[in-house]
Amino acid sequence: MIRMSKRLGVILFVSCISINSFAKSMEADVNAVPEYNYDNIPYYENEGSLLVKMRLNGVFAHAKQKNLPAPTVPQPLPVGEFVKNGYGGDISTTIFFNNYFATELSLGFNVLRTKNSVLSNVSYNYGVGATPGKSKPLYMIPATITGQFHVAPFGGIRPYVGLGYHGSYMITQSSGIKIRNGNGFVGQIGLDFYAKDDTVINLDIKQYYLNPKIVYKPSLVGNQNITSRTKLNPLVVSIGIGFSF
């Protein structure tokens, strides 16, 4: 019995030494882990309630015509898309009500070009066959307001979506046509990349819904004006820089 007690005592003593050594080893390993410096994590803070952006635009338009009167010639030519794709720019101010909701006011200037082949075909279809000359620019100047929802307003990349309305002033230098002003809804998606606290790289896409009237003048189609509508609906893809205040 005494021998067994001694053996148990020895075993207990050795176990205590082993447990103590293991605990010290674990403590050393924990202390050896370096502390992470959280000050090195990039943090983007936007304290400003105004964000001013300047952007360059690529304009993609189809401009299919509709509601043209019946041609006066027996074998009319097809009338295709009215304008070519174009380019432009805009400037905007985004007003933040809180971190998630904002409104954007923008004014743009976009340049498209009329297609001579379409003007020639329209002139032929109404018995005139006039030659429209060189392709002329078509200017679209949209004033736009959108309400925005910023999906993830914290961090370096901040996506947003928007919905709004626009009024577009239309000008053309072509002597044979006149295009009316138009208005309609606007859909918007975009990304703000915060390079610094107050500097933003912006990628923005707007879908304009625009169906302006086109008036073909007598010099192109005969004795009286001919009116149609064109489904312009330009898609404007923009990239630019912004600053928060």
Swiss-Prot record:
GO terms for cellular component: cell outer membrane. Gene3D superfamilies: 2.40.160.20. The keyword Membrane applies. Its main location: membrane. Pfam families: OmpW. It is found in: Cell outer membrane. Residues 1-23 form the signal peptide. Keywords: Cell outer membrane, Membrane, Signal, Transmembrane, Transmembrane beta strand. InterPro entries: OMP/PagP_b-brl, OMPW. It comes from the Bacteria. Coiled coil: none annotated. GO terms for biological process: transmembrane transport. Belongs to the OmpW/AlkL family. This is Putative outer membrane protein RBE_0022. It comes from Rickettsia bellii (strain RML369-C).
